[in-house]
């Protein structure tokens, strides 16, 4: 089961762990965050993945790190980025 674990959170920094995931969502979130004003750092890291015998997918627990400038609230920017991803998915569904 996939879920998100908050590792660290303050006004200008958030680190999340995406448990049992791969590069897909982490990379997308990072790219959307990098386009946002006030973002100083948006990155993700993945330790060596393992093969999930149930799904045949290589999974790991990627961590996403977001750092913002002093004027920008990290949680707000992360929520905006996640909303942008949902909007992109909805637009794609409409266009199909």
Curated annotation (Swiss-Prot):
A GO-annotated cellular component: cytoplasm
EC number: 2.7.7.6
Keyword Transcription: yes
Chief subcellular location: cytoplasm
Alphabetical UniProt keywords: Cytoplasm, DNA-directed RNA polymerase, Nucleotidyltransferase, Transcription, Transferase
Subcellular location: Cytoplasm
Top-rank EC class of the record's enzyme: transferase
An annotated GO BP: DNA-templated transcription
Catalytic activity, as annotated: RNA(n) + a ribonucleoside 5'-triphosphate = RNA(n+1) + diphosphate
Keyword ATP-binding annotated: no
Superkingdom per UniProt: Archaea
Subunit structure: Part of the RNA polymerase complex.
HAMAP family referenced in this protein's UniProt entry, alphabetically: RNApol_arch_Rpo11 (MF_00261)
Protein's UniProt name: DNA-directed RNA polymerase subunit Rpo11
Organism: Methanococcus maripaludis (strain DSM 14266 / JCM 13030 / NBRC 101832 / S2 / LL)
């Amino acid at each position: 089961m996939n879920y998100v674990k908050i590792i660290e959170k303050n006004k200008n920094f958030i680190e999340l762990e995406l448990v049992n995931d791969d590069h897909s969502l982490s990379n997308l979130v990072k790219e959307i965050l990098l386009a946002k004003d006030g973002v100083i750092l948006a990155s993700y890291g993945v330790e060596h993945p393992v093969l999930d015998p149930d799904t045949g997918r290589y999974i790991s627990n990627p961590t996403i790190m977001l750092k913002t400038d002093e004027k920008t609230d990290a949680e707000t920017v992360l929520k905006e980025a996640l909303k942008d991803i949902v909007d992109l998915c909805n637009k794609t569904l409409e266009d199909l």
